[in-house]
């Protein structure tokens, strides 16, 4: 929890309580359904929660923003972002049903009414969104066709509506393969933990 309050200093009591509840909830569910690797569960706040919140350092979602989280797994980055932005609407999808079960159970325990989670492939999602977020799902070039037509035009943020990828390592080849303009935001510019030295938020747009 100290990691979260180190970088996000204006959280409400309710937000603080929600973030504090994540560790016991995920440990309990992970014992039943392996949604987070066993070696990472003790570093939940560093490797999953704070990592997810790096997106908030790139774009500060305005009230009413609609966000789609593709391949959410156990709820990352969607659940931490939904706690941080209670007045935004989040749709979380994953092709593995048991993971979505965990997401729904945790969102319900936290009372997060701004999350809807579905056992669904990205291609089958209906509606349009201001931003699409995703973490460690697939290469950019493969991902883009899945979400074609799912972005609302332009928007009201400094960054135009687009896709925010949580990525790691050298992305030069992946970016070239995508044939898209991709903007890179090193997470080490926002968080000083060693874990983030090679981590980035990659941003691009697709019509």
PLM segments and residue spans:
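Conserved alpha-helix/loop element of class I SAM-dependent methyltransferases that forms part
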Residues: 28, 32, 45-63
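Conserved beta-strand signature within the Rossmann-like core of class I S-adenosyl-L-methionine
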Residues: 155-170
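Conserved SAM/SAH cofactor-binding pocket of Class I
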Residues: 53-134, 144
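N-terminal auxiliary segments of SAM/dcSAM-dependent transferases
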Residues: 1-38
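Conserved hydrophobic residues forming the short capping helix/wall of the S-adenosyl-L-methionine
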Residues: 30, 106-107, 151
């Amino acid at each position: 929890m100290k990691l979260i309050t180190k970088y996000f200093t204006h959280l409400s009591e309710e937000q603080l309580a929600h973030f504090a509840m994540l560790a016991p909830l995920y440990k309990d569910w992970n014992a039943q359904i392996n949604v987070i690797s066993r070696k990472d569960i003790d570093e939940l706040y560093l490797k999953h929660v704070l990592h997810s919140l790096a997106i908030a350092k790139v774009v500060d979602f305005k009230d009413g923003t609609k966000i789609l989280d593709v391949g959410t797994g156990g709820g990352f980055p969607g659940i931490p972002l939904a706690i941080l932005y209670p007045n935004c609407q989040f749709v979380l999808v994953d092709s593995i049903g048991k993971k979505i079960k965990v997401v729904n159970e945790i969102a319900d325990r936290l009372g997060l009414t701004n999350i809807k989670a579905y056992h669904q492939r990205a291609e089958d999602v209906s509606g349009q969104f201001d931003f699409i977020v995703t973490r460690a799902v697939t290469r950019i070039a493969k991902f883009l066709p899945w979400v074609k037509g799912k972005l609302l035009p332009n928007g009201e943020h400094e960054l135009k509506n687009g896709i925010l990828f949580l990525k790691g390592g050298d992305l030069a080849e992946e970016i070239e393969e995508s044939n898209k303009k991709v903007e890179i935001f090193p997470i080490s510019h926002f968080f000083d933990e060693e874990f983030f030295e090679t981590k980035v938020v990659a941003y691009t747009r697709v019509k």
